[in-house]
């Protein structure tokens, strides 16, 4: 613990907490100040001046990062017949119907993404209390309720991320790993930032992005200047 505290202090000394860095500077600092002994994730966080209690100010969606996330996603698909076969051919890790519902209700959660065809949502809905709190419930807004299961599986395997503003207007997302080249992290960050800009509700007032930051799994938060993108 003492060693970790020393490493954290050393990392903090390299970051000016009063400064908002350019996206390139921030990415370089995030890599430099990471002291985890594993290939840590690089995460970005946005604090948005929105009121999610209003239906027209809720922000939620999905996108495919140009350079992926560096994480292998375990994809589960609820489908039957030809659609089940399409999901399997596309590389889904688990495909089924009621058998998967029973397995999940029994405590099994060894998957990262859940996709379903629209006709399967009646049985998937029974898993709301399990999947909902974990942000795993299929949703049309994130492209996880779809008839094109092959595309959904391929995107999930290829670097697709989902995002959602919480009650305080915070949005967080993983944009890669520390082992990524800096330019690839910058490209991913810029792609996600563009999505956040376009997601601004028409009814939002005042400064939309009140804070943007980047960090690693065990690193320090680094403020980013939104105008540098």
Curated annotation (Swiss-Prot):
Pfam families: Ribosomal_L1. InterPro entries: Ribosom_uL1_bac-type, Ribosomal_uL1, Ribosomal_uL1-like, Ribosomal_uL1/biogenesis, Ribosomal_uL1_3-a/b-sand, Ribosomal_uL1_CS. PROSITE patterns: RIBOSOMAL_L1. It comes from the Bacteria. GO terms for molecular function: rRNA binding; structural constituent of ribosome; tRNA binding. GO terms for biological process: regulation of translation; translation. Disulfide bonds: none annotated. Belongs to the universal ribosomal protein uL1 family. Part of the 50S ribosomal subunit. Binds directly to 23S rRNA. The L1 stalk is quite mobile in the ribosome, and is involved in E site tRNA release. Protein L1 is also a translational repressor protein, it controls the translation of the L11 operon by binding to its mRNA. This is Large ribosomal subunit protein uL1. It comes from Streptococcus equi subsp. equi (strain 4047). The gene is rplA.
């Amino acid at each position: 613990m003492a060693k970790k505290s020393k490493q954290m202090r050393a990392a903090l000394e390299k970051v000016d907490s009063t400064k908002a860095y350019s996206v390139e500077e921030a990415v370089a600092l995030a890599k430099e100040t990471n002291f985890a002994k594993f290939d840590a994730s690089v995460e970005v966080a946005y604090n948005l001046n929105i009121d999610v209690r209003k239906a027209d100010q809720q922000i939620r969606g999905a996108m495919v990062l140009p350079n992926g996330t560096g994480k292998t996603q375990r994809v589960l698909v609820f489908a039957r017949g030809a659609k089940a076969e399409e999901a399997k051919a596309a590389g889904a890790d688990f495909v089924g119907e009621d058998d998967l519902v029973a397995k999940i209700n029994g405590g099994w959660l060894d998957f990262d993404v859940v996709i379903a065809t629209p006709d399967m949502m009646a049985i998937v809905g029974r898993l709301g209390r399990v999947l909902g709190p974990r942000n795993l419930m299929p949703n049309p807004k994130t492209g996880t309720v779809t008839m094109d299961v092959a595309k959904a599986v391929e995107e999930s395997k290829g670097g697709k991320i989902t995002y959602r503003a919480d009650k305080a207007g915070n949005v967080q997302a993983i944009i890669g790993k520390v082992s990524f080249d800096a330019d690839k992290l910058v490209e991913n960050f810029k792609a996600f930032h563009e999505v956040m800009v376009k997601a601004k509700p028409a009814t939002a007032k005042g400064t939309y992005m009140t804070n943007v930051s980047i960090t690693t799994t065990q690193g320090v938060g680094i403020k980013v200047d939104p105008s540098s993108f």
